[in-house]
C-alpha cells in the first residue's frame, strides 16, 4: 500500500473514494464542510436522513455527490463530540481500514486530520491513521489455492492520499513510522497464521536469517549441540518429544552508539503446543499453532525498527521448539537443570513456555542489558483474568512497567499490570528441586511470572503475557500482530531519550 501526503480540498480530488469524518450531532469538520458547500447542502441533507449511525466507526457511502470529483464519499461517524478521544478515533480508523480493504476503489483520499484528537498531536494522528489503514488491508492466503470469483476482483485501496493543511518533515516521518509498524504487524501475523507443519523452529530461524540479510542485522542460530554446551537443560527438556530440531535465535540491531546498552526482547517460540505428556484437550488444539506469537512479535518488531532506522541497540532472543508427546518426551516429575544452574521439577509438561524462556533470560545476562522484556502466550489464566483486551504485564522494576503501560496507551496496544509479590513465590516450592514449574490452580499468571523472575536478578525485566491478545478465535480467527505496536512505541520512546 502506497501512502502520500498533500494539501488541497476534498471536492476537487479525482479519486475512487474520499473519506471524511462527522460527529453524531451533524457537526462537520473542514473537509466535510467543503464537500457540503460544493454540493450546495446536499451532503448535510443526506446525513440528516439518519442513515449514518451515531456510534463511532459507523459508515455511510454516498455515490456521485454533486460538486465532488470523486466517485464516492465515505462518511465515518466519530461518535458524540463531547465523548471524542482515543477510543472513538481508533474505532473510526478500524472501520475505515476494513472498508477500504474490501471496497472497489483502488485509490482513496482520507481527509481526517482536520479533527483534532484531544491530547494528541498531528504526528500521532497520522501514525495511527496509516497503521490502521495498512493493517486493515492485511489478508492471509499463503496456504490457500489461487483466489477465485468476485473476491479476487476487490483487492481494496492500493494508493492512499492523506489530505492535510500543511506538510512537515515530522508528519512525513510519522507516516513512515505507521507504515513500518504495520509491516511489522503483518510479519507477526503471517508467522502466527502459518500452520505448525509450515512454521517450524527451523522456519522461524530461516525467517530471522532472511530478515538479517534484508536489513543488515547480525543473526546467529544455535542448534541442539550449541544449547547443550551452554547447559540449556530446561529448554532442551521441552524439545525431547519432537522430531523437529529446536533452535535458539539471536538477533542484533545496532542503531545506537557502541557503548549504549541494548534493550533485549525475548520471544516464546513454541511452534506447536500439544501440551506434551500432559496432553491438552482436543477442542481448539489447532489454535496452539499461535503459541509462537511471542517469537513472531520479536521478529515483527525487528522489522519495524529496522524500517524506521531507530537510533537504539536491540537484541532479540527466540528459543523455539515444539512441545510434543513421545517416547523420549519429558515426563511429569522429571527434574532438569537450567542454564542458570537452578533445578526444576516439571510437574506439568504443558507449562513449557517458562521452561524455554528461563534459559533465554539467563542467556540475556551476557549483553548487560538496559532492560529485558519477554513476550509470551504463557497462561490461560491471563485470559481468564483480563480477557482479550489488554496484555498482562508483570515486572521487577516499577519504572519499566510504567514505561510499557504508557506506551501501550499511546499505541492503543494496551497492557495491565499484575503484582509480582514475594508471597507468591511460596507456591513454587518443590520437595525434589529448587522449584516446581507450576504453582497450583490459583494466580496462574502471577506464579508463571514469579518463576521467570528467578532468572532475572541481574537486570530490569518485564514480562508481557499475550495469551489473550495474540490471536482471536471464531469467524475472524487469526493472529493480531500484537504486541508489535506496543513494543515499537516503547523502542521509539527509548530511542528518543526515555530511561535506559
Swiss-Prot record:
Could you tell me the superkingdom of the organism this chain comes from?
Bacteria
CDD domains per UniProt: Peptidase_M17
What does it catalyze? Release of an N-terminal amino acid, Xaa-|-Yaa-, in which Xaa is preferably Leu, but may be other amino acids including Pro although not Arg or Lys, and Yaa may be Pro. Amino acid amides and methyl esters are also readily hydrolyzed, but rates on arylamides are exceedingly low; Release of an N-terminal amino acid, preferentially leucine, but not glutamic or aspartic acids
Task: Give its E.C. classification number.
Answer: 3.4.11.1, 3.4.11.10
SUPFAM superfamilies xrefs: Macro domain-like, Zn-dependent exopeptidases
Please state the protein's primary subcellular location. cytoplasm
Q: Spell out where the chain crosses the membrane.
A: none
Q: Which UniProt key words apply to this protein?
A: Aminopeptidase, Cytoplasm, Hydrolase, Manganese, Metal-binding, Protease
Q: Name one GO cellular component term.
A: cytoplasm
First-tier enzyme category under EC: hydrolase
Alphabetically, the GO molecular function entries are: manganese ion binding; metalloaminopeptidase activity
Q: Disulfide bond: present as a keyword of the record?
A: no
Cofactor dependency: Mn(2+)
Q: How is the cofactor bound?
A: Binds 2 manganese ions per subunit.
Database matches in PANTHER family: CYTOSOL AMINOPEPTIDASE (PTHR11963:SF23), LEUCINE AMINOPEPTIDASE-RELATED (PTHR11963)
Task: Give the function comment from the record.
Answer: Presumably involved in the processing and regular turnover of intracellular proteins. Catalyzes the removal of unsubstituted N-terminal amino acids from various peptides.
Family under the similarity heading: Belongs to the peptidase M17 family.
Task: Tell me the HAMAP family matching this sequence.
Answer: Cytosol_peptidase_M17
What is this protein called in UniProt? Probable cytosol aminopeptidase
Amino acid at each position: 500500500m502506497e501512502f502520500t501526503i498533500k494539501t488541497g480540498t476534498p471536492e476537487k480530488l479525482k479519486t475512487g473514494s474520499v473519506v471524511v469524518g462527522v460527529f453524531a450531532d451533524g457537526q462537520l469538520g473542514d473537509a466535510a464542510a467543503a464537500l457540503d458547500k460544493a454540493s450546495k447542502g446536499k451532503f448535510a441533507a443526506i446525513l440528516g436522513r439518519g442513515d449514518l449511525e451515531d456510534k463511532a466507526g459507523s459508515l455511510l457511502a454516498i455515490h456521485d455527490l454533486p460538486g465532488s470529483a470523486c466517485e464516492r464519499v465515505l462518511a465515518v461517524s466519530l461518535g458524540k463530540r463531547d465523548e471524542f478521544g482515543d477510543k472513538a478515533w481508533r474505532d473510526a480508523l478500524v472501520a475505515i481500514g476494513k472498508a477500504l480493504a474490501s471496497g472497489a476503489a483502488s485509490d482513496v483520499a482520507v481527509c481526517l486530520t482536520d479533527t483534532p484528537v484531544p491530547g494528541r498531536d498531528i504526528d500521532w494522528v497520522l501514525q495511527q491513521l496509516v497503521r490502521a489503514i495498512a493493517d486493515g488491508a492485511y489478508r492471509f492466503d499463503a496456504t490457500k489455492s489461487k483466489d477465485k470469483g468476485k473476491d479476487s476482483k476487490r483487492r481494496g485501496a492500493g494508493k492512499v492520499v492523506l489530505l492535510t493543511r500543511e506538510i512537515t518533515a515530522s508528519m512525513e516521518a510519522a507516516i513512515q513510522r505507521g507504515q513500518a509498524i504495520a509491516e511489522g504487524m503483518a510479519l507477526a501475523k503471517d508467522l502466527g497464521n502459518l500452520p505448525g507443519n509450515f512454521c517450524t523452529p527451523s522456519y522461524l530461524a530461516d525467517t530471522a536469517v532472511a530478515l538479517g540479510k534484508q536489513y543488515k542485522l547480525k543473526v546467529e542460530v544455535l542448534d541442539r549441540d550449541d544449547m547443550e554446551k551452554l547447559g540449556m537443560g530446561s529448554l532442551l527438556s521441552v524439545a525431547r518429544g519432537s522430531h523437529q530440531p529446536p533452535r535458539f535465535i539471536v538477533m542484533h540491531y545496532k542503531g545506537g552508539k557502541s557503548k549504549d546498552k541494548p534493550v533485549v526482547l525475548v520471544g516464546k517460540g513454541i511452534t506447536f503446543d500439544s501440551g506434551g505428556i500432559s496432553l491438552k484437550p482436543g477442542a481448539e488444539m489447532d489454535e496452539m499453532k499461535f503459541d509462537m506469537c511471542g517469537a513472531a512479535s520479536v521478529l515483527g518488531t525487528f522489522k519495524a525498527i529496522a524500517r524506521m532506522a531507530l537510533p537504539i541497540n536491540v537484541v532479540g532472543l527466540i528459543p523455539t521448539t515444539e512441545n510434543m508427546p513421545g517416547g523420549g518426551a519429558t515426563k511429569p516429575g522429571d527434574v532438569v537443570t537450567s542454564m542458570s544452574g537452578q533445578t526444576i521439577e516439571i510437574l506439568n509438561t504443558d507449562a513449557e513456555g517458562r521452561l524455554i524462556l528461563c534459559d533465554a533470560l539467563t542467556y540475556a545476562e551476557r549483553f548487560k542489558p538496559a532492560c529485558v522484556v519477554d513476550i509470551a502466550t504463557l497462561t490461560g489464566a491471563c485470559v481468564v483474568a483480563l480477557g482479550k483486551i489488554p496484555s498482562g504485564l508483570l515486572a521487577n522494576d516499577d519504572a519499566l512497567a510504567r514505561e510499557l503501560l504508557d506506551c501501550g496507551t499511546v499505541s492503543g496496544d494496551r497492557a495491565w499490570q499484575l503484582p509480582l509479590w514475594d508471597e507468591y513465590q511460596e507456591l513454587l516450592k518443590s520437595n525434589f528441586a529448587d522449584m516446581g514449574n507450576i504453582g497450583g490452580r490459583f494466580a496462574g499468571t502471577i506464579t508463571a511470572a514469579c518463576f521467570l523472575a528467578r532468572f532475572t536478578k541481574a537486570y530490569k525485566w518485564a514480562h508481557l503475557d499475550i495469551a489473550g491478545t495474540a490471536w482471536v478465535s471464531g469467524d475472524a480467527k487469526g493472529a493480531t500482530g500484537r504486541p508489535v505496536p506496543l513494543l515499537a512505541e516503547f523502542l521509539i520512546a527509548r530511542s528518543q531519550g526515555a530511561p535506559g
